[in-house]
Regions:
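Hydrophobic/aromatic side-chain positions at a characteristic register within alpha-helices
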Residues: 36-39, 43-44
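Alpha-helical linker/edge segments of TPR/alpha-solenoid repeat scaffolds
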Residues: 76-106, 115-118
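Internal interaction segment
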Residues: 188-202, 213-285
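Short solvent-exposed coil/turn linkers within tandem alpha-helical repeat scaffolds
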Residues: 59-71
Length: 285
């Protein structure tokens, strides 16, 4: 595979040759054909990016050379095919690493299928059978689709909380505010519970990831505030679940990219097939 320096060198040489040829007495047709030949050579050498750049130059500099451009119609899909195959190789490597990381981390999680909920969720194994409603603290979870969320529970002191904060020597971060609605912000029997979803609470996950091991205070913000040390398990729940959610998101995006590249490769090959000229009858003899 060509590195960036090699690509820049080849591109510079190619463009210099083009400028030199433009200064001579060659016709536009001859100059356009020279670009086509250089693009073809770049494809043969495996420098697909250079080939695409040359073909773009052909199109912009010699738009009236229709015959030459038609003769080069097969080159662009060939270059795109080469580019796409390389992107697939890179994506496959990244996907393999991401999948290995996902599978390794999944050993620390359990899937909880609660019939009272619309869908189940992943949680660290230590909290697979926890009863968050009966304690003060937080619990991080992941949906089957990989969305990160945090549920807070406060029964030590009613403050009608609508947000959470984490504070340590590095600073302080907070979730978004979720106003009381009896659904995501729920109060019953002296217990206050809120579900914070995705971007509403990912700042907490990133904060703990950036400050591993630092003693941290959990703050319930509302009409009043209530502070308590963030327990080791609650911290582990947020840190590991946030990391797992990022891995699942990365894995999903890589799979989507792989599917896109497969489709792109097929389109390029279909175009190659349509633009490949059959040899003349005399050439077959």
């Amino acid at each position: 595979m060509y590195n960036v320096a090699n690509k820049r060198t080849l591109l510079g040489v190619a463009m210099a040759m083009l400028l030199f040829s433009c200064g001579g007495k060659d016709t536009d047709t001859e100059r356009a054909e020279a670009i086509v030949n250089q693009a073809d050579s770049a494809i043969t050498a495996g420098d697909y990016d250079l080939a695409v750049t040359l073909l773009d130059t052909l199109k912009s500099r010699y738009p009236r050379e229709i015959k030459v451009q038609r003769g080069a119609m097969n080159l662009r899909p060939r270059a795109i095919e080469g580019q796409t195959i390389r992107q697939i190789e890179i994506t496959d490597s990244m996907l393999a690493a991401s999948s290995h990381r996902r599978d390794s981390m999944m050993n620390y999680f359990s899937f909880v299928n609660n019939p009272e909920l619309v869908e189940g969720y992943y949680v660290i194994k230590e909290y697979a059978n926890s009863s968050l409603f009966n304690r003060t603290g937080v619990e991080a979870r992941i949906t089957p689709e990989g969305e990160f969320y945090i549920i807070s529970s406060l029964n030590a002191k009613p403050v009608k909380h609508t947000s959470l904060s984490l504070k340590n020597q590095a600073g302080e971060v907070s979730t978004a505010t979720v106003d009381y609605d009896g659904d995501r912000n729920y109060r019953s029997g002296g217990t206050e519970m809120i579900t914070f979803v995705g971007a509403e609470c990912d700042t907490l996950g990133q904060f703990l990831t950036d400050n591993r091991g630092a003693a941290t205070i959990l703050i319930f913000n509302g009409a009043k505030s209530y502070s308590t040390p963030l327990s080791k398990l609650d911290r582990k729940s947020i840190e590991q679940t946030y990391e797992m959610a990022n891995v699942l998101t990365e894995n999903r995006k890589l799979n989507l990219k792989r599917d896109f590249l497969d489709r792109q490769l097929q389109v390029a090959r279909d175009q190659i097939a349509r633009t490949t000229q059959e040899p003349a009858a005399d050439d077959k003899d």
